[in-house]
Each structure stands twice: as structure tokens, then as C-alpha cells.
Amino acid sequence: MKKEFIDVINKLANKGKELGFYHLNMENESFDGKHLTVKGKEYIYFSSCSYMGLETNEKMKLAAIDAVQRYGTQFSSSRTSISLTLYEELEDLLGKIYGKPTYLAPTTSLGHISIIPTIMDTRDAIIMDQQVHNSVKNAVQMVKGDGVYTEILKHNKIDYLETRIQILKQSYDRVWYMCDSVYSIFGDTAPFKDITPLLDRYEQFHLYVDDAHGMSWAGKHGRGYVLNQMPFHEHMIVTSSLAKGFGSCGGALIFNDEAQKELIRNCSSSSIFSGPLQPAVLGASIASAKIHLSNEIETMQDELFERMFYFVQTAANHNIPIINNEMTPIFYVAIGKPEVGQKLSLFLQNEGYFSNYMVFPTVPMKNSGMRITLTRHHSLQDIQKLLERVAYGFEKIMKEENYSMEELYEDFSMIDPSKSNKVEPVIRLKVA
């Protein structure tokens, strides 16, 4: 990254800190998953990625305490040497959730660093979606330096992806497409119904999916969005995060067979040299996995889907411009002009709501917006009141800034949602 760009990011970050948007500290003496206290003011928290609300689950808290009582605060050894039996128990449970061999990494980011440099070499070509998570891009940079061919695909342009596969397969043994299942800013999803046929059509085509934001709220046993949309393919690797919907910490690496899993266990640098997860985390994760393997997770999924559907309906009723209605727990209110976004964020904070104000360079300059995430901790009334304040503040500030909805739609290449959006009933496909 060039120094000039670093300087721009640093300047914007410092400005955001001055305005009270970033690098804040929660002052709560305890946390219920919904209420925050920052600088003496209480907020309803609408930027958590703990979609299922499991971080406050009593079973998980008691399991974490029990693990600490039994094993201490840390078992300080590389897993190459020796690890707690809790690891084996958790990986076995994760394997039952996914129906495939699963390896546990300290984080999803370290999981990418485990897989990509170990499995891929100069016989491979890598195509990254433009919006794939930065942790994937960082791992790809490691192999790019070793001569692995990489390129960027415009976001979700699957027709062009097929063209690139046809060309690259003539020169490379494997052509990888790397994408997120659910994209963390706009909440949109990868078009797996269009990607799946390519895996069967082209022998050299392989798929690498980061399903961090799809875990728990979607799929049988909460196995995630991607495996709720398509069956596991032999030319596929899936990674996920236990730090979001799952309610604990760690990265799940899901493979087609045991040989791939053992290759990562034996040869990846982060597997050999990284420290282990703490006993408390492993204990809580085991409790969460047992919840996922019970009927309880289906009830939790239904509760979250009710909130997601209500959000989409209510936003449409208030003519709030939402980037997509794909029924994920991540929603992006299109604002466009940074000055409008800054004022709206401050307005919502003053009203007692905490969400993420997204601005350049995280999003394009004229694509600023409010990222709002839903969890089971929120009530329908919480959502209704938030969106009422968003609608009121949005209209008021747009007028103050002399910024029209027509300009906003042009900046986002959108059609007026009041004329085009149609809220359909939620249908959850279940893939065994």
C-alpha cells in the first residue's frame, strides 16, 4: 500500500475519531448484547455481528467457566506438539455440523494464511471477487510474491468469470474463484446458483468461499449460507468464523476429505507456529456446537428471520433506500454524499442508536452509508423506532445539504426503491 494512501486513511480515521465514530470504548460494567454505554450515554447497539445473540447464552458462559476451572486460562503449546482434548471434541462436532472434515484455526484470517500458501502454487490461477474480504486478499498476496497468477473480477460478474475460466484453464491446472458468501458491508450474497454449474462444467475450476457472515443463521445445523445454497463440491473449500453468529472465537476450515485437512494440520505455517485457542473459548464453542446440532438453532433462526423480514418491510414503508433485500442480517442504507452520512450518523447517536457509518476508503467516495446489523437481541419495536428515526433524519438532512434522491440513486446506480422493490416472503432452502 502506497504511503500517500496510508496518509489519506490515517487522516480520515483521525477525523472519524474526533467526530466520535471510531475507536470507541464501551463503558458497560456488564453487557446484554443490546445496550452500550459510551462516554456516559446509553445506546441501542445495531452493529454487532453476533447475529444469533449467543455471546450471552448461559450454557456457553457456564461451559467457558467450567473449561477454565478444569484447564486454566491457557494451555500454552503449539498444536503440532500437543493440544487439549477439547480441540478434538470441538472439531468432531463441527464436522457433524458441516458434514465434512473440519479443522479449527485460531482465527479465520489465520485460516486463510494456513490454506492458500499451502495448497496453491504456480500451477494455479486465482481470481478474486472485487469485494472479497481483505483477509483473503492478504493471504493471496503471500502466494502472489511466489509467482502465483492473480486477478480481480468485478463484483459478482459471473458471466465474465466463465470467460476467464475458459481462457485460464488453457495455461493452469486449477483456476480458483475466491469470494465471500455474504459480503460484510452491503449484505449482498454471492450468486451460487450461477457458480455451481461452473464447477461441473469445468474440471479445472475450484471454489474458495469465506462464509464468515453466513454462519449459524442459515442452513441445516447453522452450517452457513453457502451450504444452504449448494451442496459441498469436491473442488471446493469453505472457511467460516466462530466469532460472529456462532458466539465464540476461531476459524472453521471445511474440506472435502481428510487428506486435505491433514495437509493443513501438518504443513501450514499458522498451524505449526500459532498459539492455541484458550480453554474458555473452546468450552464455549463446544456448547455452541451442541446448540447448533439441536432443534434450538432452528427456533433461533426463525426468530432472526422474523426480524430481518420486518426490517425490509418497515424500511420499504418509509422509503428508506436499502442496497439490497436479500434477507441477510446486514443492511446498508444508501446515503451517498459523505456530508449527509456524517450528519445522519451524529443524529442517530444523539437519538440513542449506535450503527456503523461507512465512508471512503471502505466504500467508494459517493457510496457512503449506514451499515445496520440485526441480532436476536433486538425487538421488533427496536427496529421500528430505529427506522422511524432514520427516515426522519434522512429527509431532514437531505434538504439541509441540498442533495436529492435522484442524485443519490445516480451515485449508487439504483432505481427508486419505492417504484421497484417488492418484498417477497422469505424462503429458506435447506440442503442436507
Q: What are the residue ranges of the model-derived segments?
A:
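Active-site PLP attachment segment
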Residues: 227-263
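Conserved PLP-binding catalytic core of the aspartate aminotransferase-like
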Residues: 298-309, 318-351, 362, 366, ...
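Active-site phosphate-binding strand-loop segment of PLP-dependent enzymes
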Residues: 151-208
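Conserved PLP-anchoring active-site segment centered on the Schiff-base-forming lysine
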Residues: 118-134
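N-terminal "arm"/small-domain region of PLP-dependent enzymes with the aminotransferase-like
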Residues: 2-71, 205
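Conserved PLP cofactor-binding pocket of PLP-dependent enzymes
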Residues: 73, 80-82, 351-371, 398-405
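Structural motif of enzymes handling amino- and sulfur-group chemistry
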Residues: 276-297, 303, 315-316
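Conserved N-terminal alpha-helix of the aminotransferase class I/II PLP-enzyme fold
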Residues: 62-107
